[in-house]
Structures are given as C-alpha cells and as structure tokens.
Amino acid sequence: MARIAGVDLPRNKTIEIAITYIFGIGRSNGADVLRKANVNPATRVRDLTEEEVSRIREIVEREYRVEGDLRREIQMNIKRLMDIGCYRGLRHRKGLPVRGQRTRTNARTRRGRRGQAIGIKKKTLKK
C-alpha cells in the first residue's frame, strides 16, 4: 500500500483518484502532480513502482501544503478572523453561515439540529 503525506492510498483505485484521498489535493492538483512525476494517471496504485511513489511523494511534500499543515493553516485563518472581530469572524464565533446565506429558515448545517418542540409528547396508553 502506497503511503504519501501520511495517508494510505487505496490499492485498487487508479492513482488519479487515489491521490485525491490526501487532504488538500483534488482532481486538478492530482493531475498536475502525476504529470510532473511522469506517472500514467490510469495506473492502479498496486502497480506503481517504488520509484514512482517516491517521485509523487517528493513533489507533494515540496510543492503542496497538505493534511495537518493545511488544516492548521485553515484553523489559524479562522481564528485570526475571530480575533480581529470582523463580520466573518463574528459569524464564525456565533456558528452562523459566513457567506451571506439566509438564516430565517434553513442554515441547519451551520446552526445544528433544531431544539425539541415544546408541548409535544407521546401520550402513554392507559389500560
């Protein structure tokens, strides 16, 4: 099993798809990496040679910010917005949508589940 940037790539998938399992590398960046490493995108991960894996690993480590470093950078950017108190930071702090979506209805992903409705209880059967 090929391991790149701390991620085990699935053996049965093509390298074109498998490389997108690395956080921070999507289809476009993955295609660029494979082009630079001179690897056929249709090759299955199990069929890659050690040399090809090491070339891919080297390019990813040298040119891209991935996994933990990228997650840390994103968190630091959000923290910076919250610290300076800008509008986007306040929205992050309150747990509301940041990019202008409506909140009168919807916004459930960001706000969480609705609280339990008051006054609606299952009646117990009397015998």
Curated annotation (Swiss-Prot):
Where does the record place the region Disordered? Answer: 99-127
Q: Which InterPro entries match?
A: Rbsml_uS13_C, Ribosomal_uS13, Ribosomal_uS13-like_H2TH, Ribosomal_uS13_bac-type, Ribosomal_uS13_CS
The record's Gene3D superfamilies line, in alphabetical order, gives: 1.10.8.50, 30s ribosomal protein s13, domain 2
Tell me which domain of life the UniProt entry assigns to the organism this sequence originates from. Answer: Bacteria
Ordered alphabetically, the record's keywords are:
Ribonucleoprotein, Ribosomal protein, RNA-binding, rRNA-binding, tRNA-binding
Q: Could you mention a single GO BP entry for this protein? A: translation
Quaternary form? Part of the 30S ribosomal subunit. Forms a loose heterodimer with protein S19. Forms two bridges to the 50S subunit in the 70S ribosome.
- State the function annotated in the UniProt record: Located at the top of the head of the 30S subunit, it contacts several helices of the 16S rRNA. In the 70S ribosome it contacts the 23S rRNA (bridge B1a) and protein L5 of the 50S subunit (bridge B1b), connecting the 2 subunits; these bridges are implicated in subunit movement. Contacts the tRNAs in the A and P-sites.
Q: What is this protein called?
A: Small ribosomal subunit protein uS13
Per the UniProt entry, what species is this protein from, by scientific name?
Roseiflexus castenholzii (strain DSM 13941 / HLO8)
